[in-house]
């Protein structure tokens, strides 16, 4: 009776060959390398946000929370992959001990999917943070804690809601070869992937529009205003919107590769051998790659922005002596 509900306990020859193959072990090395690099750059990015922050306080807070979440997600992914590789060595000749029962994966699934969804919906928080900043800057800069806290709460609700739809109440039956694979009786994952994609596409459209408006506004301010504060705010707004735009596009590309890459090879499962399918699937860990992109963009964008600021200051002081003289010249040229 249990076998009818759970499915076969013993791995088929194709799954055994795939899980003990060199390509799957290479995929583990690639994923482990990406994860350790993400740990290293997450530390650098957190230090950059705390010591040399180039973002608004609201954006900074959202990015810090997302970085901490990415560390938890990477740790969960690493633990799952180590567990899988360990079994592939120890039980290579015992197919009935190679697979994981759903009950063995419950804790890993909880952390993996919650942090996965939280990472996905970070695009929502970052997009609306920029949107509010552009359309209501006075409210935004006076209520930054309220804005960031509200957006993070919505992000959490979206993550828990998606987890509830996908995994809550799923019967604890079935076997999988890697613990983050979709449980046997979880039937809503295709709908979840579609919903996540819609959210991300919507956010990409909105943030590109906000970035366009920020660039246009900054050019107008550079032409019509000689207020250092106003010009500085416009420049910083463009830089932040550009960084968020890059983050969202990279996040979308990585998650699209994961969600639809796996769905695509599943749709072709009947056309390929079971061994080929289980050999290819471990490479499609999109959120793992996205969790490396996040600290990379924050860290290198911070360094680039600081360098550009120094260059601008050096040009101003070398050409016009001091900032006061420079602003007087600008004022005369605009009169």
Curated annotation (Swiss-Prot):
The keyword rRNA-binding does not apply. It is a multi-pass membrane protein. GO terms for biological process: sensory perception of chemical stimulus. Gene3D superfamilies: Rhodopsin 7-helix transmembrane proteins (1.20.1070.10). The chain crosses the membrane at residues 22-42, 151-171, 195-215, 245-265, 280-300. InterPro entries: 7TM_GPCR_serpentine_rcpt_Sra. GO terms for molecular function: G protein-coupled receptor activity. It is found in: Membrane. Keywords: Membrane, Transmembrane, Transmembrane helix. One of its GO terms (cellular component) is membrane. Disulfide bonds: none annotated. Coiled coil: none annotated. Pfam families: 7TM_GPCR_Sra. Belongs to the nematode receptor-like protein sra family. PANTHER family: G-PROTEIN COUPLED RECEPTORS FAMILY 1 PROFILE DOMAIN-CONTAINING PROTEIN-RELATED (PTHR31582:SF2), SERPENTINE RECEPTOR, CLASS A (ALPHA)-RELATED-RELATED (PTHR31582). This is Serpentine receptor class alpha-25. It comes from Caenorhabditis elegans.
């Amino acid at each position: 009776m249990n076998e009818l509900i759970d499915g076969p306990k013993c791995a088929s020859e194709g799954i055994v060959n795939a899980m003990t193959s060199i390509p799957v072990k290479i995929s583990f090395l690639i994923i482990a390398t990406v994860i350790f690099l993400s740990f290293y750059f997450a530390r650098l990015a957190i230090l950059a946000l705390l010591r040399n922050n180039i973002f608004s306080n609201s954006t900074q807070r959202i990015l810090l929370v997302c970085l901490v979440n990415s560390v938890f997600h990477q740790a969960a992914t690493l633990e799952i992959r180590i567990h899988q590789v360990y079994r592939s060595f120890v039980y290579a000749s015992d197919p009935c001990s190679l697979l994981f029962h759903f009950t063995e994966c419950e804790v890993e699934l909880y952390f993996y999917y919650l942090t996965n969804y939280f990472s996905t919906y970070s695009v929502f928080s970052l997009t609306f943070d920029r949107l509010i900043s552009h359309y209501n800057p006075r409210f935004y800069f006076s209520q930054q804690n309220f804005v960031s806290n509200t957006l993070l709460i919505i992000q959490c609700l979206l993550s828990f809601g998606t987890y509830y739809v996908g995994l809550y109440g799923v019967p604890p039956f079935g076997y999988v070869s890697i613990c983050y694979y979709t449980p046997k009786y979880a039937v809503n994952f295709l709908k979840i992937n579609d919903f996540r994609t819609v959210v991300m596409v919507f956010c990409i459209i909105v943030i590109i529009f906000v970035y366009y408006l920020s660039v246009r506004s900054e050019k107008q301010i550079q032409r019509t205003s000689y207020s250092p504060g106003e010009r500085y705010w416009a420049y910083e707004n463009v830089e932040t919107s550009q960084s968020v735009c890059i983050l969202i596009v990279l996040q979308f590309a990585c998650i699209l590769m994961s969600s639809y890459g796996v769905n695509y090879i599943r749709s072709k499962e009947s056309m390929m051998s079971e061994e080929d399918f289980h050999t290819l699937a471990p490479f499609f860990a999109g959120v793992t790659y996205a969790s490396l992109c996040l600290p990379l963009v924050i860290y290198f964008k911070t360094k680039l922005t600081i360098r550009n600021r120094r260059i601008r200051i050096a040009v101003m002081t070398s050409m016009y002596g001091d900032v006061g003289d420079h602003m007087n010249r600008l004022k005369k040229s605009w009169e």
